Amino acid sequence: LTEAKAGLGAVGDYVGLEVNMRPAGGYTTDMTNFAHSTDVYEIWADMITANRRLLPDCGVHCCCAYAGRRDFHRYAHTHEEILSRYADSIVMCERLPEVMWPQMGNQMYMAKLRDQEKTDAFIRFVQERMK
């Protein structure tokens, strides 16, 4: 920045013009589907074939969180503990392809949660490291 901008930064700070804060690949559409209990592919097909959305909004909306883990870290909670504690919330759990490891970790957990507080707690639990 050449001049200070409130809420953005001070003179000399670098500011990302575009910051990609989503998982790579098809996970974004999965997360949208889970968070809104919908099917974005069907909505897209409706737009192409009928020029409008035909799939009704079921009105069920929540948060969908992605939490990744790396094999080289020691975590406070085991894979089994995560699955047990969040059994009713986890919608996807898988080992990622090696090409995604540097950006997204080796193991991913995706969960559908009621609100931001529960979402933050899920991410903290999954990613908490041993001290």
Question: Which residues are covered by each model-predicted region?
Answer:
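Peripheral (often C-terminal) accessory segments that flank ATP-dependent C-N-forming ligase machineries
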Residues: A45-K131
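C-terminal, non-catalytic macromolecule-binding modules
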Residues: H36-M47
